[in-house]
């Protein structure tokens, strides 16, 4: 299966996380080692400014069984579609001006906008939102907000959608990203979604935690 970065084509090598630590002779030394390892893991979520100027970017699959790749008429967006009406979409956007610090509040704001947009285009929408760590970067989980939604589309069909959203208000280049899997309810597949997520990663993540 192939994959492409939304910011630049080609291979992108990341740093492997080093979980090893030397044995310590005291409890205080062991605590210090644990803290160092924790910081090392966070540091491994490094930034490559050649991609998106250092903004968070997606590594997105260009091939997946039963799906075809298409470039959306929207900067920083890519999509896979299938013959059943399914869409798998990744987007990334930079803030036009520095936002107020606070990833959680900014992520909630973008999530609310997504919900309002779907509600405006559909009927009977039901949804729930919770924190999620299913998306990874450099092998480490990235805390995001996941919304599961059900609604009736303009075509009268029942649909299910899952969207992951995360805002990054600080760091090299603040912005926000989203990943959406939406299909008619009859063709929604948890197994298929899991396979697609395994090929979809975030890069240029400086902080994985969804802090206040």
What residue ranges belong to the model's regions?
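Second-shell loop/turn segments in exported
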Residues: 97-105, 131, 182-187
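Short, solvent-exposed recognition patches
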Residues: 100-125
